[in-house]
């Protein structure tokens, strides 16, 4: 299974103490998985580990700098070493470090470039439904 995933937490890595959700898609089948304890229809958050342990590879934007370290910090989750990791932020920076000039390589900037704006969300200390859409 090759997953693309994202998490939402209650702060930046230094402050994060709560993971609100993890959303993933199997890139081979297109099946999506939403893990969140606050929305009906989502899998319980604690079950994300079972999916991640099945993965042959995981892909995401800034997952080496935030998502994976946040999961380890908050929940003790460590991805098995044999799982391939693709961080699209690092890939973007490596392939063309000046792609957007000094605007960086954020998902916000990529969203603008591709015409798919990332939903704006500013309050991370409390859960909101908008987080699920953003994730």
What do the predicted segments below correspond to?
Residues 2-5, 13-14, 19-135:
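Conserved DEDDh/DEDDy metal-dependent 3′-5′ exonuclease domain
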Residues 10:
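Conserved Rossmann-like nucleotide-cofactor binding loop
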């Amino acid at each position: 299974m090759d997953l693309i995933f994202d998490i939402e937490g209650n702060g930046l890595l230094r402050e994060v103490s709560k993971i609100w959700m993890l959303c993933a898609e199997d890139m081979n089948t297109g099946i999506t998985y939403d893990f969140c304890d606050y929305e009906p229809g989502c899998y319980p958050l604690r079950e994300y580990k079972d999916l991640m342990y099945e993965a042959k590879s995981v892909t995401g934007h800034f997952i080496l700098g935030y998502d994976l370290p946040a999961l380890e910090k908050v929940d003790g989750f460590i991805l098995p070493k044999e799982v391939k990791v693709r961080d699209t932020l690092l890939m973007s920076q490596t392939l063309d470090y000046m792609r957007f000039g000094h605007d960086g390589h954020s998902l916000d900037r990529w969203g603008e470039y591709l015409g798919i704006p990332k939903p704006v969300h500013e309050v991370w200390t409390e859960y909101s439904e908008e987080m699920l859409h953003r994730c």
